[in-house]
């Protein structure tokens, strides 16, 4: 089996690329970073530090790399069996034209063996969004062929891969946590279902997408925002602060109550999942900066994301949400010189006041009780 993976960054190398290569799949990375491309093509291998209770070093080998802009990547799309991405939600639109060109070439070469494309991004149904961009870039006469022969498979991914400086200045070395979860929608594949250790197949993807969004992402963001306010440097420092831990755990329990109502998750198993996530935040090997985790607060405060979406669920089912409100208020306080969204958030609050600003960002009704609760919590933090 041959695969092309867009994005040779830390998540690409440390998570998806590693699983594919470990499964014996012939893997090529596509990226724009020439230093990384040159290193991959010189060595065809790299090291991954897997850290949890213990630390181990795995070597990923037999990999190649091409530029994601150029003819090589188009040629590969015409030949491979699987295309995966870990490029970040914003970049999906930028890689779509190259994918479209590759699919046209595949059609021209009469390659009708099934191709499956899986976007492994921190977003809900990212592959469906990528498909929209690819379809827009395709000529009309290729669209029906692509619908017939190409599967666009949505997935939920979960593994913390913090940026970490290599002790050896090796541009390929990467550190990842032991935990990893890659859940894919088995109803969207073309052809036979792949057997890749570490890839879990489900016919109820949204339950797992929301479980991760409402637990890991919600908890991570609130830890970062409260941690930043309290002057902590890392996620570990923040979650070891008992006051912060109580709010984060409470928020995950509130969002968990929504999941249990909506999808029928087992309450005891979900409580154990929350404990596992708190343990991941404490991982001493992951020097995960609160500023990195908190960045892009406008996106994180939008209606479909990790703070507002679970809050809307609590309103839908008439459930408590005090800790989620605390997290939202802390997010409104997020300031970072390196993050344009943090600056935009500050300007919006200064210009319109917290009530109108939160309503504009989140889509919540400015006159609603929850916005009033969030504004009260926001002011109490000043």
Swiss-Prot record:
Belongs to the mannitol dehydrogenase family. It is an enzyme of class 1 (oxidoreductase). This is Mannitol-1-phosphate 5-dehydrogenase. Its EC number is 1.1.1.17. InterPro entries: 6-PGluconate_DH-like_C_sf, 6PGD_dom2, Mannitol_1_phos_5_DH, Mannitol_DH, Mannitol_DH_C, Mannitol_DH_CS, Mannitol_DH_N, NAD(P)-bd_dom_sf. The modification N6-acetyllysine is found at residue 269. GO terms for biological process: mannitol catabolic process. It comes from Escherichia coli O9:H4 (strain HS). It holds the Pfam family Mannitol_dh_C. SUPFAM superfamilies: 6-phosphogluconate dehydrogenase C-terminal domain-like (SSF48179), NAD(P)-binding Rossmann-fold domains (SSF51735). NAD(+) binds at residues 3-14. One of its GO terms (molecular function) is mannitol-1-phosphate 5-dehydrogenase activity. GO terms for cellular component: cytosol. The lineage of its organism: Bacteria, Pseudomonadati, Pseudomonadota, Gammaproteobacteria, Enterobacterales. Keywords: Acetylation, NAD, Oxidoreductase. It catalyses: D-mannitol 1-phosphate + NAD(+) = beta-D-fructose 6-phosphate + NADH + H(+).
